[in-house]
């Protein structure tokens, strides 16, 4: 048998063959995956703020260090001598001299579109999609709230389907929730229990242009300008969004929001329980939540009814994330992202939220406050999206919005309801399946 002698150019040929195969594979991946199934897209408007932002300015208040965003639509593009383009108002402390510079500008959020999903399965409620608008065919992003064949109503900011309120799943609540940057947590005594509790009130500052505090030249202490303190108002939580502060929202489209969420980190000490009180407007009896790590139970009292759920074992050396949601007339309690209690509510809840440690009754106010602050961290209040009857600039309905959705059509809304042009205002109200481009990957 003669020995095999490869051609001298065989290694070069093999390298070229491998390169050609690699190029073909890359082209196929780009064509069928990146360009076909996962298409990049840049959000171009504020209609889905704050979940998805269009062009915006990212700012930080020099007074309270709160980070916030505003849209860029009404900003001048240039200013002389490196001066600020404009001044913004902090949504937390109402300081009205937050400078806006050109280098704070950001493009819209970059998202990916799953183009194959609309052809593989039906679109689900609360999903966000890219589609062509029925009036002019423009590409835009909205959220699906109404499905084919349903009768949809908008009442008091909520979505009703076939006469029943539609509760968002917990994951959707976390995706859609909007931070409430204003408000104060204050210590007060509960008359019924004699305990001091930490209560939240949506107190706002009147917009002001001078700092509340000024550092002394000779020390690290600060002086407060008492003669120039802004007045505070207890205004309540509303559907106003700081991104829209330069648009001048119609007064008729400003509404109080009762669908709130409280989140905090709890580091329990031994078996000491934690209580959360919510005010019930109708019965004037508080809804009480008692977290008891000693016997691993959560007890919930609503009017004359008492419910009990299992509480997971909570390590005392680690903080645990607690979420209490009142979205869509439903009480949801989660610990470390796991739901432990859900119950529909027939009552209206009013602020304040109030936290206390029942085992501290013999302690002074200062000692109780210290114990609460030692165990409770990162207190934050959120609100749900409030859907208005119509966007600003359109006549509002007198009672509620109602529509029946045809077959193979969908009803879509933007999260920034006051300034979203969507199914409420399009001449051709509904979006068909064939107009949908793909599902948004947030």
Predicted regions and their residues:
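Extended hydrophobic leader/signal-anchor segments used for secretion and membrane insertion
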Residues: 1-442
């Amino acid at each position: 048998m003669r020995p095999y002698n490869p051609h001298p150019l065989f290694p070069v040929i093999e390298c070229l063959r491998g390169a050609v195969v690699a190029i073909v594979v890359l082209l196929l991946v780009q064509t069928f995956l990146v360009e076909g199934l996962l298409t990049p897209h840049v959000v171009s408007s504020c209609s889905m703020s704050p979940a998805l932002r269009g062009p915006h300015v990212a700012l930080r208040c020099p007074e309270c260090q709160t980070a916030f965003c505003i849209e860029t639509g009404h900003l001048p593009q240039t200013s002389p001598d490196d001066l600020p383009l404009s001044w913004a108002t902090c949504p937390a402390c109402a300081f009205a001299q937050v400078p806006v510079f050109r280098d704070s500008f950001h493009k819209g959020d970059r998202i990916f579109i799953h183009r194959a999903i609309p052809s593989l399965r039906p679109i689900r409620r609360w999903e966000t999609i890219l589609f062509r608008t029925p009036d002019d065919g423009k590409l835009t992003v909205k959220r699906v709230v109404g499905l084919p064949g349903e009768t949809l109503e908008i009442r008091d900011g909520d979505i009703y389907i076939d006469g029943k309120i539609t509760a968002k799943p917990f994951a959707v609540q976390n995706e859609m929730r909007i931070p409430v940057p204003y408000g104060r947590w204050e210590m007060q005594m509960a008359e019924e229990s004699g305990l001091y509790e930490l209560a939240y009130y949506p107190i706002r500052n009147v917009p002001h242009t001078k700092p509340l505090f000024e550092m002394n030249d000779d020390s690290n202490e600060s002086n407060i300008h008492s003669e120039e303190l802004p007045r505070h108002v207890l205004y309540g939580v509303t559907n106003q969004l700081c991104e829209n502060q330069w648009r001048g929202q119609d007064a008729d489209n400003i509404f109080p929001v009762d669908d709130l969420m409280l989140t905090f980190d709890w580091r329990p000490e031994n078996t000491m329980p934690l209580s959360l009180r919510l005010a019930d407007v109708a019965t004037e009896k508080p809804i009480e939540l008692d977290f008891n790590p000693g016997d691993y139970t959560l007890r919930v009292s609503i009017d004359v009814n008492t419910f009990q759920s299992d509480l997971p074992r909570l390590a005392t050396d680690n903080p645990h994330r607690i979420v209490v949601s009142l979205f869509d007339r439903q009480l949801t309690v989660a610990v470390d992202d796991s739901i432990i209690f859900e119950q529909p509510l027939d009552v209206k809840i009013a602020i304040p939220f109030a936290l206390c440690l029942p085992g501290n009754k013999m302690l002074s106010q200062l000692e109780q406050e210290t114990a609460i602050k030692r165990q409770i961290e990162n207190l934050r209040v959120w609100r749900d999206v409030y859907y208005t009857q119509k966007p600003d600039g359109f006549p509002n309905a007198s009672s509620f919005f109602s529509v029946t959705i045809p077959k193979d059509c969908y009803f879509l809304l933007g999260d920034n309801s006051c300034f979203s042009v969507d199914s409420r205002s399009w001449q051709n109200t509904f979006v068909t399946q064939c107009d949908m481009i793909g599902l948004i990957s947030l």
